Design a protein with these regions (language model features):
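Catalytic cores of carbohydrate-active enzymes
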Residues: 1-53, 59-73, 77-85
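Non-catalytic C-terminal accessory modules of carbohydrate-active enzymes
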Residues: 81-180
């Protein structure tokens, strides 16, 4: 079925709806943005990016901790500053009573909350590399001030390895070579 959308009269912008019909919302997620992640129906490679941006801007719950997906969804929409803020927030939050810094939480699943770290890791990867079918897009949501060495996997047994300095790729290797 088509993704439910509507036009917002005062802005004349379209937005994604959580469902074709619904009564009241009963948890702290933004189901309308599932069309961005995990289903990837909207994004940088797809039509309707403005509609997805509007849905992200108007989401009811603005959170990046636990299993909240703002970090991933903002990266997939190319919103680099927002993705960077969410990723930093997730990685910097740790539980002071735990021996290991990566024992995030307590969020929704208590301690350790591995959803919290996995969301940050997926978002960080999508900030560096995104893909759709055979197409690869590098640095779609990467802040220019961040430098990084990376080695990431993409579909079709592809590995993208490189270095980014001051917003520019200074070293890149894609294997197999025909995927470059």
């Amino acid at each position: 079925p088509p993704v439910p959308t509507r036009c917002i009269p005062h802005t004349r912008r379209g937005t994604i709806l959580p469902a074709a019909e619904y009564d009241e919302l009963a948890n702290c997620e933004n189901p309308e943005l599932y069309a961005v992640f995990p289903y990837r129906l909207f994004g940088l490679f797809r039509p309707g990016i403005d509609t997805a941006h509007a849905a992200y801007e108007m989401r009811l719950f603005r959170k990046s901790g636990g299993w909240q997906q703002d970090a991933i969804q903002s990266a997939l929409l190319g919103l680099g500053d927002e993705a960077a803020r969410c990723v930093k927030e997730n990685f910097l939050e740790c539980h002071g009573g735990s021996r290991f810094p990566a024992f995030w939480g307590p969020n929704y699943d208590w301690i350790p909350d591995m959803d919290h770290g996995s969301v940050a890791c997926v978002a960080l990867q999508r900030m560096l590399v995104q893909y759709d079918g055979d197409a690869l897009l590098l640095l779609p949501a990467w802040p220019k001030a961040w430098n990084a060495d990376f080695r990431l996997h993409a579909p079709r047994n592809t590995v993208v390895e490189g270095r980014v300095e001051n917003g520019k790729i200074v070293r890149l290797a894609v294997t197999p070579p025909e995927r470059e």
